[in-house]
Amino acid sequence: MVFLLCFFLVADVSYGINGDCELPKVVGPCRGGFRRYYYNSSSKRCEKFIYGGCRGNANNFHTLEECEKVCGVRSRDSPKEN
């Protein structure tokens, strides 16, 4: 049982990006204005956006490095401005 769990975890990391990274960018209805990064599945890059502070989703990272690490982005190109 443990073997199967480990196998599926490794397969998920090896053959696809984190499912949270496929979620759409959500600014949210609040007006906080926090600089965050999200994975854009169309451009296959982590991009900067302004987060309102509430009702976001898991595709919301404090740093570019965190976004790239979680979402498996290999290139270190400058983030796209939105």
From Swiss-Prot:
An annotated Gene Ontology molecular function: potassium channel regulator activity
Gene3D superfamilies the record matches: Pancreatic trypsin inhibitor Kunitz domain
Domain BPTI/Kunitz inhibitor: 21-71
Span of the signal peptide: 1-16
One GO cellular component, as annotated: nematocyst
Proregion residues excised on maturation: 76-82
Compartment(s) where it occurs, according to its Swiss-Prot or TrEMBL record: Secreted; Nematocyst
InterPro entries hit by this protein: Kunitz_BPTI (IPR002223), Kunitz_BPTI_sf (IPR036880), Prtase_inh_Kunz-CS (IPR020901), TFPI/VKTCI-like (IPR050098)
Keywords noted in UniProt: Disulfide bond, Ion channel impairing toxin, Nematocyst, Potassium channel impairing toxin, Protease inhibitor, Secreted, Serine protease inhibitor, Signal, Toxin, Voltage-gated potassium channel impairing toxin
Annotated site (Reactive bond): 31-32
PROSITE patterns per record: BPTI_KUNITZ_1, BPTI_KUNITZ_2
One Pfam family recorded for the sequence: Kunitz_BPTI
Cysteines paired by S-S bonds: 21-71, 30-54, 46-67
UniProt similarity note: Belongs to the venom Kunitz-type family. Sea anemone type 2 potassium channel toxin subfamily.
Its biological purpose: Serine protease inhibitor that inhibits both tissue and plasma kallikreins. Has hemolytic activity. Inhibits voltage-gated potassium channels (Kv).
Name used for this protein in its record: U-actitoxin-Avd3m
Organism in which the protein naturally occurs: Anemonia viridis
